[in-house]
Amino acid sequence: MEMDMDIIRKAIAATIFALVMAWAWRVLDWAWFTPKRIEKRLRQQGFRGNPYRFLVGDVKESGKMHQEALSNPMEFDNDIVPRLMPHINHTIKTYGRNSFTWMGRIPRIHVMEPELIKEVLTHSSKYQKNFDVHNPLVKFLLTGVGSFEGAKWSKHRRIISPAFTLEKLKSMLPAFAICYHDMLTKWEKLAEKEGSHEVDIFPTFDVLTSDVISKVAFGSTYDEGGKIFRLLKELMDLTIDCMRDVYIPGWSYLPTKRNKRMKEINKEITDMLRFIINKRMKALKAGEPGEDDLLGVLLESNIQEIQKQGNRKDGGMTINDVIEECKLFYFAGQETTGVLLTWTTILLSKHPEWQERAREEVLQAFGKNKPEFERLNHLKYVSMILYEVLRLYPPVIDLTKIIHEDTKLGPYTIPAGTQVMLPTVMLHREKSIWGEDAMEFNPMRFADGVANATKNNVTYLPFSWGPRVCLGQNFALLQAKLGLAMILQRFKFDVAPSYVHAPFTILTVQPQFGSHVIYKKLERQNF
């Protein structure tokens, strides 16, 4: 009997030992052998980069370079790549265009050839979003149709698309105009007292565009929308911290201060949105007409999709899905337009000849009247200026995908588990595409449209390209055109003496040390 127990104990011990060894091997394979195998395959195909460092990869080196780059402002020019992505810039200069870096244990190749870029963006089912390599809590913010793949992405995009048709955008214009009118009227009153008015424009446009989103997304529930925006701003700051860290699986479950706060904010936002959505759904079921805002259009489109699918439970979006899309409306819509208006104002301050050209065009089209949709879309100089600002200061500095199986890309076979980065801010400065003046602000390059400016290459990516091109790009451009036109009708502007040129990236490209601009009322009132 005693011998039997001894055998059992040894068997249990042997089993535990075997399980521990199997687990240790899996961890070692995940953390060391797999990255080294991928590195070997990349090097065999001519890719070059730093050797893999256990778990951290290039994170420490990249972080140090990033800190150094941001510690000092720069001259006012558009050579912002060394400041925004110093480690990528250093790697490409050191190892060439066919190079790779390490995001922890994940290798990331840089793709800069137009034909390969087109291939990546055309085959979105192979080259997918890479949110899975981050802390899962990142998905509290980076969610919705932009983060989905496959059938779920296709269904969500189909349901959401009706909210962004030209007809719907046209109906949003009055709400845009009210928000801009209220802000500019305040500026005029302050400028009348003091002769001019100095504004830190990025936070001002940030709040303004959030007001616009609140109005067009939630209509009559605008006040609740404002509260959601404030919580989302805090969630964005915490999300950025998460994305800068090397993610260790399971870390999101630990009760750290940041993890707890992110979960609290997400619950609060989710509860508020659920209340708004349930109220709308009850009204629709009671036969009341839907509201003509983004949420109203989304809910009606969702009901139609469910009916088309034979009222199947999984035929449309769930309430939770709608909540995630509302978060995306807020974050993407507000951030993109806010930074676009900010950099447009700064660049037009530095190029007064283009400011004057745009103003003359706006005044000829509208005089002092409120801009209207049809003619707004035919403002050639204003459109060219916005395209050029998006080239030099795109909202996001790169598009990064991940592949989950070995994938042929041009002459290369990219190993599964590799990230593929399209460095947008670099591509937008390629002299072979844009000419010798690629670093200069020259809206004339877009006089004959984007295709002509890029020589029909897929190298202009402020809103991505292909099947996953940003649904809201026309929303952002229309709002920016209206805002810029209304500002030009009333003010001349120049950067304040205190302005320091220091672009940096917090999800989007923003001014690091403020964005102070001086506005002076136009003397000419009889247009």
Curated annotation (Swiss-Prot):
Pathway where it operates: Alkaloid biosynthesis
The UniProt record lists the keyword Heme: yes
Gene deletion effect: Large increases in loganin accumulation.
Keywords for the protein's UniProt record, in alphabetical order: Endoplasmic reticulum, Heme, Iron, Membrane, Metal-binding, Monooxygenase, Oxidoreductase, Transmembrane, Transmembrane helix
Ranges facing Lumenal side: 1-11
Subcellular location: Endoplasmic reticulum membrane
Entry's transmembrane regions: 12-32
Residues that bind heme: 470
Tissues in which the protein is found: Expressed in leaves (especially in leaf epidermis), and, to a lower extent, in roots, stems, flower buds and flowers.
Gene3D superfamilies in the record: Cytochrome P450
Catalytic activity: loganin + reduced [NADPH--hemoprotein reductase] + O2 = secologanin + oxidized [NADPH--hemoprotein reductase] + 2 H2O + H(+); secologanin + reduced [NADPH--hemoprotein reductase] + O2 = secoxyloganin + oxidized [NADPH--hemoprotein reductase] + H2O + 2 H(+)
Cytoplasmic domain ranges by topology: 33-527
GO terms under biological process: alkaloid metabolic process; response to jasmonic acid
Pfam family, one: p450
InterPro entries reported for this sequence: Cyt_P450 (IPR001128), Cyt_P450_CS (IPR017972), Cyt_P450_E_grp-I (IPR002401), Cyt_P450_sf (IPR036396), Cytochrome_P450_Monooxygen (IPR050665)
Entry cofactors: heme
Single GO molecular function: heme binding
Gene Ontology CC: endoplasmic reticulum membrane
EC number(s) recorded for this UniProt protein: 1.14.19.62
Function, as annotated: Component of the seco-iridoid and derivatives monoterpenoid indole alkaloids (MIAs, e.g. secologanin) biosynthesis pathway. Catalyzes the conversion of loganin into secologanin. Catalyzes the conversion of secologanin into secoxyloganin.
Protein family according to the UniProt entry: Belongs to the cytochrome P450 family.
Protein name in the entry: Secologanin synthase 2
Classification lineage: Eukaryota, Viridiplantae, Streptophyta, Embryophyta, Tracheophyta
